[in-house]
Curated annotation (Swiss-Prot):
Localisation per UniProt entry: Membrane
Organism per entry: Arabidopsis thaliana (Mouse-ear cress)
Record field: transmembrane: 35-55, 59-79, 107-127, 151-171, 273-293, 318-338, 389-409, 416-436, 450-470, 507-527, 559-579, 601-621, 636-656
Signal peptide range in chain numbering: none
GO cellular component: plant-type vacuole; plant-type vacuole membrane
Role of this protein: May be involved in the transport of nicotianamine-chelated metals.
Protein name in the entry: Probable metal-nicotianamine transporter YSL4
Keyword Transmembrane listed: yes
The organism's place on the tree of life at top rank: Eukaryota
Gene, per the UniProt record: YSL4
Amino acid sequence: METEIPRSTEISETLLLPETNLDHGEYVPEWKEQITIRGLISSALLGILFCIITHKLNLTIGIIPSLNVAAGLLGFFFIKSWTGFLSKLGFLSKPFTKQENTVIQTCVVSCYGLAYSGGFGSYLIAMDERTYKLIGSDYPGNNPEDVINPGLWWMTGFLFVVSFLGLFCLVPLRKVMILDYKLTYPSGTATAMLINSFHNNTGAELAGKQVKCLGKYLSLSLVWSCFKWFFSGIGGACGFDHFPTLGLTLFKNTFYFDFSPTFIGCGMICPHLVNCSVLLGAIISWGFLWPFISQHAGDWYPADLKANDFKGLYGYKVFIAISIILGDGLYNLIKIIVVTVKEICNKSSRQHNLPVFTDILDKSKTSVLMREKKKRDIIFLKDRIPLEFAVSGYVGLAAISTAIIPLIFPPLKWYFVLCSYLVAPGLAFCNSYGAGLTDMSMPSTYGKTGLFIVASIVGNNGGVIAGLAACGIMMSIVSTAADLMQDFKTGYLTLSSAKSMFVTQLLGTAMGCIIAPLTFWLFWTAFDIGDPDGLYKAPYAVIYREMAILGVEGFAKLPKHCLALCCGFFIAALIVNLIRDMTPPKISKLIPLPMAMAGPFYIGAYFAIDMFVGTVIMLVWERMNKKDADDYSGAVASGLICGDGIWTIPSAILSILRINPPICMYFRPS
């Protein structure tokens, strides 16, 4: 996810209760039995769906919520439906265990994770000719030789050589991070509790209702998306996606509700603070800042420039958004490194500050808890992953990657790739440890760091491509390492084998290396990707290419006062984060998140309206019936997102066949 947000908030507290009700006599299958053919088939189908959803979000707004709940729920639904169907035909089927459910969820998440860390909405597409032309052929540092257009084969090959290294670099530390440090990995813990709840009587009944709820809203979302298509016309300015719900004046400043089930679903999943931060960012930028700068057209920048010219207002939009993102990312990177070092060095602090389960249980339950913990520890450590296997795997893959990547990206020399792999394990540890403490995984922040360093060293002789490729290497390793450790936590709490988790991650990553490029290619061939006036703007492609150019050229060619404004917003992002950490929780939870505020500065205000509608729905629902909201909101939101995502497939096929919508619904002043 480009905008990285805490993910644990999407699961209600009631799902944590089954943790204390572990049945000590339950059968735990061997690690090979936890990985089934039906599970892998379900994972592949769900991986396709979630890759499409991730691409759609990545290419429109760049904010991707966690889909772990939907993956676990739909995995449960697929296998239960399959076993139920076979039983009606008179066939006996293997019992569906929580370990198999965990394997499916892990496989799906590792598969669709590559749709994000693979850079299809950021660093890879930033290399293409459209992004080059959008910035301008006469723009300093934007050279025609720094162009590599997307290709299905080279993108697939690139993913295969970079995506597996992160799985090997931290495997030897799984005992240290899960058992010794007792890192919580809130999203992994919450997902485990959700899966545990599915496989007891009470939880199975609720899960059945959640599946029905998800199916209902998935159908509604699919039908609505199909209905909208008939009015969307040719081009990008027709239909409900451009409905001036707040009036034509505000519509010109991108303030309108576009009836998007995906964005409403995102608003229901994301914390209220994230949605309010996004809306605040939209109000500051499109309500005040851009109109103010527009008044100085002809003074600060030439008045006759095109809307997408970086010498004009467009330059302010992109570079101020970059400044906020970098300020927020730098602060959190330093914060997590400091917390990591402090926690490692201070053993007593680690024991008292980390939320260990024994802290919240009565003394009468201590013996039960100890038996539960002992059983988990035994199962987690039972199937070893040899140290020599992990080390040799990392070294071997790094050697192959060091040889192949310079063939794909000639400006990125082999010694840059080698240096990246030497420092990557340390950065992966920092990110994984930080994710375990705070639930914030920040692969794009580490990637941008590598981007700037490599681009500035290489310079004008291919620095843009080299920086973007280095960003991809770092993002892939750091992201997959954190995901693996989080899945180890999920497996630990569901009595799943660590070896089955690791093998499933390998299988899911292999699926993702094929599925993610194929599903992206569907978008690439069917839609006008990167059109700033279209639906699939690919907003972060321009931002990443500009970052690389900035690393090569410096700040000399920015529009008038742009550097001063960028510095101001960069410092503001640092200060806001510092205030959030220094104030009491009652106050800090009301302070906006700079990273969430940055998106609308460049993309527009319309998706902020949609996401705020989602948060209003949740607030009203929680006020009316909090238990139902806790139980079913995730299913409703996932249904809205999945239904709209499924419609992308027939929509893309119609576009490829040149079948256009029959009606253009358009609005103009009377």
